[in-house]
Amino acid sequence: MGLKEEFEEHAEKVNTLTELPSNEDLLILYGLYKQAKFGPVDTSRPGMFSMKERAKWDAWKAVEGKSSEEAMNDYITKVKQLLEVAASKAST
């Protein structure tokens, strides 16, 4: 399985989490996903009254130095971590 296929698979797996990840984890995933799929952020930063959109933009901007492949690998690693945490909580 190639990197792109594994990335797409983990993008689907994240939807199977039984517990919603923290906002911090969600923003990390968002930034990595956008960087992997679209490359560096290409829009202006949302205004201060659009707090949710601004946080998402900041998360994407934070990873703009990563290549698409690096972002895919980091995304896969993060999803695996979240799945492991969910599995350990389910077994206790």
UniProtKB/Swiss-Prot annotation:
InterPro entries: Acyl-CoA-binding_protein (IPR000582), Acyl-CoA-binding_sf (IPR035984), FERM/acyl-CoA-bd_prot_sf (IPR014352)
ACB domain sequence ranges: 3-88
Entry's localization field: Cytoplasm; Cell membrane
Disruption of the gene: reported phenotype: Enhanced sensitivity to freezing stress.
Family annotation (Pfam families): ACBP
GO cellular component: cytosol; nucleus; plasma membrane
Lineage, uppermost ranks: Eukaryota, Viridiplantae, Streptophyta, Embryophyta, Tracheophyta
UniProt protein name: Acyl-CoA-binding domain-containing protein 6
Main localization of the protein described in the UniProt heading: cytoplasm
Main function: Binds medium- and long-chain acyl-CoA esters with very high affinity. May function as an intracellular carrier of acyl-CoA esters. Confers resistance to cold and freezing. Interacts with phosphatidylcholine and derivatives, but not phosphatidic acid and lysophosphatidylcholine. May be involved in phospholipid metabolism.
CDD domains from the UniProt entry: ACBP
Residues reported in the UniProt entry to bind an acyl-CoA: 30-34, 52, 56, 75
Family from the record: Belongs to the ACBP family.
Keyword Cell membrane: yes
Tissue: Mostly expressed in seeds, stems, and siliques, and, to a lower extent, in leaves, flowers, and roots (at protein level). Highly expressed in root and shoot phloem companion cells.
Keyword annotations of the record: Cell membrane, Cytoplasm, Lipid-binding, Membrane, Transport
Gene3D superfamilies linked: 1.20.80.10
UniProt entry tagged with the keyword Cytoplasm: yes
GO molecular function annotation: fatty-acyl-CoA binding; phosphatidylcholine binding
Subunit and partners: Interacts with PDLP8.
